[in-house]
């Protein structure tokens, strides 16, 4: 079990941010000086600063990262971050207030992302998100080992599939196929689609 110090270190927004509001003060300075600002976070705390955003929203885009609609999967990969429901609510609140919003969907993972991806895309369109950015799992030395450990511990029935995709040469085939499926599904939708791969 992780120590409380480790848990705090892994939170999207540190407890100190709530007290000192450093991000809020930086955001205010950027927007007051007409600096184009893009915020990407996993935290619904971003809505705390909506009053500042509304003063100069023309130079601002705000995005939240979501890897899946499934809270069980989310807890395994992002145990200390806000729930998917809280993130979607934040995106909706920002969009409803005229802030340009986007969603970073990544890293996309077999089954974890796939099973709820199409529903997630529809939900994001309905709440007014203007752009979806998709990214693959960047397999680096040691990272796929860590990923396989998480899968083995939490989803042993998926271990063989993940081993095949991330160590057995199916990596690019999987992501190329998924990219084509996403492009087909998103054709005619009201948002821009961007891929990081």
Features from the language model and the residues they span:
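A cross-taxonomic marker for long C-terminal extensions/tails that follow the last structured domain
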Residues: 161-197
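Conserved AdoMet/S-adenosylmethionine-binding subsite of the radical SAM
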Residues: 1-174
């Amino acid at each position: 079990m992780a120590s409380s110090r480790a848990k705090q270190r892994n939170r999207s927004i540190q407890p100190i941010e709530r007290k000192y509001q450093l991000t809020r003060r930086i955001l205010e300075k950027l927007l007051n000086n007409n600096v184009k600002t893009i915020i990407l976070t996993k935290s619904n705390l971003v809505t705390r600063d909506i009053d500042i955003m509304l003063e100069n929203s023309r130079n601002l885009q705000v995005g939240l990262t979501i890897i899946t609609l499934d809270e069980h999967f989310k807890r395994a990969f992002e145990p200390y971050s806000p729930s998917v429901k809280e993130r979607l609510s934040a995106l909706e609140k920002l969009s409803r207030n005229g802030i340009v919003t986007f969603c970073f969907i990544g890293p996309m993972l077999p089954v974890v992302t796939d099973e709820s991806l199409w529903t997630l895309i529809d939900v994001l369109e309905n709440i007014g998100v203007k752009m979806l950015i998709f990214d693959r799992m960047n397999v680096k030395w040691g990272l796929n080992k860590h990923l396989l450990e998480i899968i083995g511990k939490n989803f042993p029935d998926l271990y063989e599939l993940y081993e095949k995709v991330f160590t057995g040469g199916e990596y690019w085939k999987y992501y190329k196929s998924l990219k084509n499926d996403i492009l087909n599904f998103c054709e005619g939708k009201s948002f821009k689609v961007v891929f990081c791969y």
